Design a protein with these regions (language model features):
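Phosphate/adenylate-binding "loop-and-lid" substructures adjacent to NTP/NAD/dNTP-binding pockets
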Residues: 171-213
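Basic, flexible Lys/Arg- and Gly-enriched helix-loop patches that mediate nucleic-acid binding at interfaces
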Residues: 1-168
């Protein structure tokens, strides 16, 4: 989804009855679902999404055929996509045709492209974690406020992060959703449930939302 009205489609913010304009942290393509953090702080968006900060985003993925050790090994090591090679990442098989993957970068449609390169097609992709924020306790289509403890921990994790935009090889020409967000300062996202940090409603509005289709 997006915060822009494109092709007369409903945007994620249309579902929120909220007085301030908020933006999703990161993107999920239209076919994906899962956790989404909404905020009105562009600097927070940039710190979380900037690839150089190496912050984790975790996904649950189902593919069209059985996963084997070679698939897990090659996905973990890095796969050529978009004129670059993806960073080494953690991949754990969870079922015959499913796995969890933890990324620290956000190339355009990265997981789908990685799987396709290895001869697989993604059937379901769900983001289940952004840094310390998870979907735990949030049902399909719901959102909640970030707790004070989550907000404190998030800020601690971001202490040494920079919000500066740095374009790297293979992350130019719109290939990286991380940098698309950095250039926009909090541009767009797709997903479903949301959270706001308790006690920060006046100035720092954060929601964690998750789109489940």
């Amino acid at each position: 989804c997006s915060t822009k009205q494109q092709f007369d489609e409903t945007t994620v913010t249309d579902y929120l009855d909220y007085p301030l304009r908020v933006y999703p942290v990161g993107r999920l393509d239209k076919e994906s679902q899962g956790l989404l953090l909404l905020t009105n702080e562009g600097d927070l968006v940039n710190k979380i999404m900037r690839a150089g900060n190496y912050h984790e985003k975790e996904y649950f993925v189902t593919v069209n055929k059985p996963v084997d050790r070679e698939f897990v090994r090659r996905m973990s090591k890095g796969v050529p996509v978009l004129d670059t090679v993806t960073r080494p990442c953690r991949v754990v098989q969870t079922g015959e045709c499913s796995f969890r993957i933890i990324l620290t970068q956000g190339l355009n449609r990265q997981i789908r492209r990685m799987c396709r390169y290895l001869g697989y097609e993604v059937q379901k992709l769900k983001r289940i974690r952004i840094m310390n924020l998870t979907l735990d306790g949030i049902r399909e289509g719901e959102y909640r406020e970030i707790t004070a403890q989550e907000w404190e921990e998030l800020n601690h994790l971001l202490e040494s992060s920079t919000s500066e935009t740095v374009i790297r090889t293979g992350e130019q020409n719109g290939n990286s959703s991380d940098h698309a967000n950095e250039r926009a300062g909090a541009k767009a996202g797709q997903g479903s449930k949301g959270v706001l940090p308790a006690g920060y409603r006046d100035h720092k509005q954060q929601r964690v939302r998750s789109d489940v289709r």
